């Protein structure tokens, strides 16, 4: 409630569109926020490894931004548990005073299947265009990952470049 009020006030102060970003938009979980953790459960797989997409939480976030006159800065990340090369442990339980490195768990790793990753990104962009319109979605910024130069990315530089290539192709498809 108060967060929406603050976002609205920020939006109203600016003569140009304000872009707003949420982390962890593709992270697996129950959608409940916790210290240094967020999740949307946008991607899971059935028992046969087939993708299941659920945009409910992301839609709620982006609907809020748009309803308040803002634009999403769509952060493409982090890795869903079903796609992570190192899914266990997945959710961290970091608390102040603990080593910060403990925050980097399964969500920070490359995908085990780059084609499934690209399809996830494509389906998200396609869903966004279907929901908000092409003109609106083309006005957004799309960011891959966040600070891959630190522990937020546990793969190699080459794996990040590969992730970038697959992601950029999927967004533009």
Where are each of the predicted segments found?
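Mature N-terminal, pre-catalytic/accessory segment of carbohydrate-active enzymes
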Residues: 1-18, 23
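Substrate-binding cleft and catalytic face of glycoside hydrolase catalytic domains
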Residues: 15-173
């Amino acid at each position: 409630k108060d967060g929406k009020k603050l976002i609205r006030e920020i939006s109203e102060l600016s003569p140009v569109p304000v872009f707003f970003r949420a982390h962890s938009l593709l992270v697996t979980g129950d959608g409940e926020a916790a210290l240094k953790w967020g999740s949307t459960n946008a991607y899971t797989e059935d028992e046969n490894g087939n993708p299941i997409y659920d945009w409910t939480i992301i839609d709620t976030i982006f609907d809020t931004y748009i309803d308040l006159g803002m634009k999403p800065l769509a952060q493409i990340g982090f890795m869903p548990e079903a796609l992570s090369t190192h899914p266990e442990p997945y959710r961290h339980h970091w608390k102040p005073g603990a080593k910060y490195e403990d925050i980097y768990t399964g969500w920070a790793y490359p995908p085990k299947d780059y084609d499934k990753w690209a399809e996830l990104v494509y389906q998200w962009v396609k869903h966004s265009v279907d929901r908000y319109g092409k003109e609106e979605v083309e006005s957004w910024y799309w960011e891959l990952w966040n600070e891959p130069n630190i522990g937020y990315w546990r793969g190699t530089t080459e794996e990040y470049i590969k992730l970038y290539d697959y992601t950029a192709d999927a967004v533009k498809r």
